[in-house]
């Protein structure tokens, strides 16, 4: 029989790597930089195909929880049970490499501007608890782990969201950036931070922002020793009545802007625990704390602060503020500082050092309770903006502007807007040589019957929009001393001047592009804001009406030579660029 005729036996060839142990499969656990309790860097066990350990004992390296990987670079994770056995089963010898679990919680995604943990909180959650208890196997996993090693798990227990390490005594590690962590959780009634380690956190910006249903918040578990940013941390937590700040270590904090803004439930606030020696920004820190009746600023070190914009804004129940503890020598921005402090009846500005301040826009806006305001202590040599500085100060009956140095001011729009209690206003002290914006300057000064405008230097002004709007009692306005070569906007300039009889517009309007509703209009709810009593109008040879809706009062206007011109209440036939005085009768 030849070789070709010999029968070929049926042989099955296995390519599987044979086990190095005849009893079963060997799993070698590599410490991968960690050492096992016996001092070795490796530990072996032998198991059979059903997962029964035949020899050896599973151990954890380094006395810490680890995640096992199929490679030493720890890129290919393998899920194991509590005995260290792969959940996928065992079919050959295995080498597993350890990597310590970090227990790191998901955090702020700066590139997308959202907090990944916040996005995990179900809309049904009414409480949040950080714990170390084991997750029930019956509950659905919420993956709250930052690096995928399974160190942090979360689940819902009724309406309570629990976040856990599942290892007794092991805390969850908060990410370094906790911005927006609990942002806008408007249904959450309580947050238990007991098992959250914040020792590595540097930013707590907007951490509890608009947690409107919180009535209490225990800050004791928080380690804030490395935090530099607490901006808007408790913003809008309007139902918290009292907040104990004593657990907070603020030694390294530089930004406290809006920290308590909108905490309208606060009736008291003890600032004693706060170390503010490194803080540079306190803008809006107490804004909207509308139930505070008193605030002791003594504990605050403000020697490095540069921004106090809106610091007391809308603290409407404060009747007085002792500013003596404040060191303001480095402040550049005091805009909105007392805005909306409608309960203030007196305000001593003497303690304020304003030598470096450039912005005092809206500084006293809507301080309706002030009847007098002594400005003599203010140094405004560097100020460039005074927009709406006294707007809405309807209680002021007199205002001495003598102390104000306005030589560098460019914006005084709305500076006296709504000062309805003023019956007289001396503008002589104002140096307006650099001012470009006078819009709304006297708007709503309904107590003025006359106003001497000759002190105003308007050569650089571009906007006179609504400049005298709603000066409802003023009888005569003469702007013949105005240089209006740069003015482009006279929109609604005189609207609401219901008592105005005489108007001198002996100015140059060659660059004005809008006069819409200059002489008034009718509001949506039917209020008539036209200058219906205007009967005397003087114009220059460089004055021209712009557009067709400036709304000069309707009627017949007679020139000095008796020539009659008409206005239909929108536009008129009075000739442009012809100096004359017109009388309506």
Task: Describe each region flagged by the PLM.
Residues 43-46, 128, 158-173, 186-202, ...:
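Structural signature of tandem-repeat unit edges
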Residues 53-63, 516-522, 526-528:
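Short aromatic-glycine motifs in intrinsically disordered, low-complexity regions
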Residues 80-84, 527, 568:
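Surface-exposed intrinsically disordered loops and tails
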Residues 34-35, 63-66, 125, 240, ...:
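Short glycine-aromatic motifs
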Residues 490, 515-518, 546-552:
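Predominantly extracellular beta-rich ligand-binding scaffolds that present long acidic/polar faces
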Residues 206-210, 232-236, 258-262, 284-288, ...:
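Short beta-strand elements of solenoid repeat domains
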Residues 2-101:
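Secondary-structure capping and domain/repeat boundary segments
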Residues 3-33, 94-184, 193, 505-508, ...:
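N-terminal capping/linker segments that flank leucine-rich repeat
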């Amino acid at each position: 029989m030849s070789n070709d005729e010999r029968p070929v036996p049926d042989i099955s060839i296995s390519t599987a790597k044979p086990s190095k142990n005849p009893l079963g499969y060997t799993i070698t656990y590599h410490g991968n930089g960690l050492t096992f309790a016996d001092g070795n860097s490796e530990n072996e066990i032998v198991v059979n195909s059903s997962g029964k350990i035949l020899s050896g004992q599973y151990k954890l390296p380094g006395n810490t929880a680890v995640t096992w990987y199929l490679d030493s670079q720890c890129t290919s994770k393998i899920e194991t049970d509590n005995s260290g056995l792969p959940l996928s089963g065992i079919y050959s010898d295995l080498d597993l490499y350890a990597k310590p679990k970090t227990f790191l919680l998901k955090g702020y995604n700066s590139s997308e501007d959202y907090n990944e943990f916040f996005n995990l909180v179900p809309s049904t959650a009414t409480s949040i608890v950080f714990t170390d208890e084991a997750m029930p196997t019956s509950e659905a996993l919420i993956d709250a782990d930052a690096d995928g090693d399974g160190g942090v798990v979360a689940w819902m227990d009724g309406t309570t969201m629990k976040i856990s390490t599942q290892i007794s005594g092991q805390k969850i590690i908060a990410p370094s950036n906790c911005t927006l962590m609990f942002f806008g959780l408007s249904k959450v009634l309580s947050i238990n931070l007991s098992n959250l380690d914040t020792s590595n956190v540097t930013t707590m910006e907007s951490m509890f922002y608009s947690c409107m249903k919180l009535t209490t918040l225990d800050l004791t578990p928080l380690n804030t020793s490395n935090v530099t940013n607490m901006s808007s941390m408790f913003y809008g937590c309007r139902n918290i009545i009292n907040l104990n700040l004593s657990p907070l270590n603020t030694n390294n904090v530089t930004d406290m802007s809006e920290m308590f803004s909108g905490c309208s439930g606060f009736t008291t606030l003890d600032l004693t625990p706060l170390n503010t020696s490194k803080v540079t920004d306190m803008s809006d820190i107490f804004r909207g704390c509308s139930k505070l009746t008193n605030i002791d600023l003594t504990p605050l070190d403000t020697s490095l602060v540069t921004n106090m914009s809106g610091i007391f804004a809308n603290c409407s129940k404060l009747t007085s503020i002792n500013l003596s503890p404040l060191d303001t020598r480095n402040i550049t921005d005091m805009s909105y500082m007392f805005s909306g402090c409608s309960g203030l009846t007196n305000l001593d500005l003497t303690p304020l050092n304003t030598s470096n301040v450039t912005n005092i826009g809206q500084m006293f806006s809507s301080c309706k309770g002030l009847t007098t305001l002594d400005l003599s202590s203010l140094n405004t040599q560097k100020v460039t903006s005074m927009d709406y500085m006294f707007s809405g100060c309807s209680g002021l009956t007199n205002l001495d502007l003598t102390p104000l140095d306005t030589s560098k001011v460019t914006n005084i729009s709305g500076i006296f807007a709504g000062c309805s209690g003023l019956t007289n206003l001396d503008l002589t002290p104002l140096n307006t040589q650099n001012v470009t914006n006078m819009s709304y300057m006297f708007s709503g000064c309904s107590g003025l019957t006359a106003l001497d405008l000759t002190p105003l230097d308007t050569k650089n002004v571009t906007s006179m929009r609504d400049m005298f709007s709603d000066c409802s009692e003023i009888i005569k306005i003469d702007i013949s001393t105005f240089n209006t070569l740069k003015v482009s906007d006279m929109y609604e300039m005189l609207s609401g001047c219901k008592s105005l009889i005489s108007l001198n517009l002996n100015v140059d309007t060659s660059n004005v592009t809008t006069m819409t509703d200059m002489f008034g209009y009718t509001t949506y709810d039917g209020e008539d804001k036209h200058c219906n009593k205007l009967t005397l109008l003087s114009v220059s040879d460089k004055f021209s009406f712009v557009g067709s809706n400036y709304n000069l009062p309707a009627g017949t206007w007679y020139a000095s030579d008796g020539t009659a011109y008409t206005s239909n209440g929108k536009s008129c036939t009075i000739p442009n660029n012809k100096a004359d005085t017109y009388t309506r009768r």
